[in-house]
Amino acid sequence: MVRSDWRAQEIRRVMTFTGSKEKTARDALEKFDWNVEVAIDHILNTPQVDLSGASKVFDKYRNADSDEIDLDGTIQYITDLGLSLEEPTVLAVAMTAGSPSVGTFTRKPFVEGWAAIGGDTLPAQQKLCRSFAESMTSLNADFQKIYKFTYGFLLQEGQRVLPQETAVDYWRLLLTGKYEHLDKWLSFVTEKYKRNISRDAWNMLYEFMLFQAKDPSLESYDEDGAWPSVIDEYVEFLKE
């Protein structure tokens, strides 16, 4: 028996035993060096996600000339989700569906991202969006993931730092109602700091908000700690 026939037989064995499709059987065998027993065990113990529903949602909005959802499709999609383009929940959608940049979705991350959490229809995605909105009302772990995602999502091709104006707009969008000193921070950034915003500065502001919530007087703030210089300058600004 030639090697290719041997592999085909092993694939059929796995398919027969697990009821899986050929691609699933082949992928499992290749992953585990063609060990049939291990491949079967892996398939039987790994939940299989149906991608067809989320793929149909993607097809409804994708550009007819390319396998992606462009700006026009994105606007219609967000509207059909029951969202406004100017609300922070849109960022949770972008993160979930692996949007590479503002106004664009590509098939694989969109389909896999939604399918993984049960978003296989538009109504299911609408329901999940309501859950996203509820989870974004405070500084919690879910919100932190979205906050950190936002920085890279907003960077345009060739950019390494976020323009100050963009950062200010999205801080206002994300942090209103969550950070009581937001107006002071934005005043500091626009009137004294006057520079573009690095990823480190963006991320560490979140950590500083948590720190300040526990120590409003900032008595325990250590300028020699791991804080970036922008936070050091902000603390000086607050104490003036």
UniProtKB/Swiss-Prot annotation:
Gene Ontology biological process terms in this record: protein neddylation
Domain UBA-like, chain residue ranges per copy: 7-44
Keywords in alphabetical order: Ubl conjugation pathway
Iron-sulfur listed as a keyword: no
InterPro entries xref list: DCN-prot (IPR014764), DCN1-like_PONY (IPR042460), PONY_dom (IPR005176), UBA-like_sf (IPR009060)
Cysteines paired by S-S bonds: none
Domain DCUN1: start-end pairs: 49-239
Protein name per Swiss-Prot or TrEMBL: Defective in cullin neddylation protein 1
Organism: Yarrowia lipolytica (strain CLIB 122 / E 150)
Gene name for this UniProt entry: DCN1
